[in-house]
Every structure is written in C-alpha cells, then in structure tokens.
C-alpha cells in the first residue's frame, strides 16, 4: 500500500507543479501603483506640510514665558528661532516658487508669542501656496540666492528642508530642556 501511495504521489507531483504554473500564469498580476506626476516636487510638498505642521505645533506648545529661553547666552532664543523660520520661509519659499516674498511688518524676537506664532503660520501658508506651483521640469533652473550666488531650484528645496529639520530639532531640544515633549514625541491623540 505504501508503494502505491508513494508511486502515486511521485507521479502526481509534476501534474501539480504544471497546474500551479498555469494558474499563476493566467492569474491577473497585482496592479502596480500609479506613477506620481512630479515625484520630486510632490515629495518636497508632502515633507514641507509635515515639517511645517511640527514646527507650528512646537511654537504653539512652547509657553509664552519660554520664548526668551536660550540654553546658553550664545544661542538663539526660542523666539529668535520662530522669527528666523518665518523670515526664511518667505525668502526660501518665494525663491523656490518664483515669487517675491510678501512685504510684512517687521517683527522682533521679543514680540509676543501670539504675534510670532501668527507670523510663522502666515509664512507656512505662503509656502503652501507657492510650492503648489512647483513641478519637476524646473528643478535645474538657476535661482538668485544669498550674496549674489545662484543655486538650482532643487538645491534651494534641499536647503529649505535641511533648515527646517535643523530648527525643528533645535526647537525640540529647547522644549525637552523645559520639560515639554516636542510634537513628534507625543503619541497620536495625546
């Protein structure tokens, strides 16, 4: 009986393998994800929205009396960081989007938290507006930058995200020194 079962199994295996090949050959392939139009600009915009959200949340979460905080005398205060980001957003996003930065009332890092946070939010709204027009066909274009130099649009985009990451980590450290959790350390819904 064992011999019959073993012989049947051996005889049946090639047929089983052939059936599997036929089934997999006729089965519909898994649908590939649709290609993203302008993958570089799209990725940049998605990153800009997330990092902007984190930076604005950090500014919202830092108590007003801590906007003058700086870990050492040589460092920027938290208010300096918020103001620097707002000014940088207007210049960098305007440059990337090929638009002049809006003319805004001059602020100081010592202005109130409400004033500084409102300005930061205005500048991220400006970034969202102008970055919506950027596409991958113009990444190689030379743009005017600091000190009369030029950089490609792609390089300015990279510089911008690096600046945001730098100042988000700086803000997160300032928050932790003051016993606060930065936005990215909080559990969702907390």
Q: Each predicted region: which residue ranges?
A:
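Short, helix-capping/interhelical loops that line the mouth of catalytic, cofactor-
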Residues: 21-43, 87-149, 178-190
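Bacterial N-terminal signal peptides
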Residues: 4-17
């Amino acid at each position: 009986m064992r011999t019959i079962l073993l012989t049947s199994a051996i005889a049946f295996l090639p047929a089983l393998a052939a059936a599997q090949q036929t089934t997999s050959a006729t089965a519909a392939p898994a649908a590939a994800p649709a290609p993203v139009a302008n993958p570089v600009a799209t990725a940049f915009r998605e990153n800009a929205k997330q990092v902007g959200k984190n930076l604005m949340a950090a500014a919202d979460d830092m108590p007003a009396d801590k906007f003058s905080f700086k870990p050492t005398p040589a460092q920027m205060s938290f208010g300096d960081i918020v103001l620097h980001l707002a000014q940088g957003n207007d210049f960098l996003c305007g440059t990337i989007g090929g638009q002049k930065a809006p003319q805004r009332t001059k602020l100081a890092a010592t202005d109130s938290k409400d004033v500084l946070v409102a300005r930061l939010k205005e500048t991220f709204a400006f970034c969202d507006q102008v970055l919506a027009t950027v596409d991958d066909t113009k990444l190689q274009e030379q743009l005017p930058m600091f000190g009369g130099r030029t950089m490609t649009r792609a390089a300015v985009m990279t510089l911008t995200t690096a600046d945001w990451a730098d100042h988000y980590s700086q803000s997160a450290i300032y928050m932790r020194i003051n016993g606060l959790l930065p936005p990215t350390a909080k559990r969702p819904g907390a």
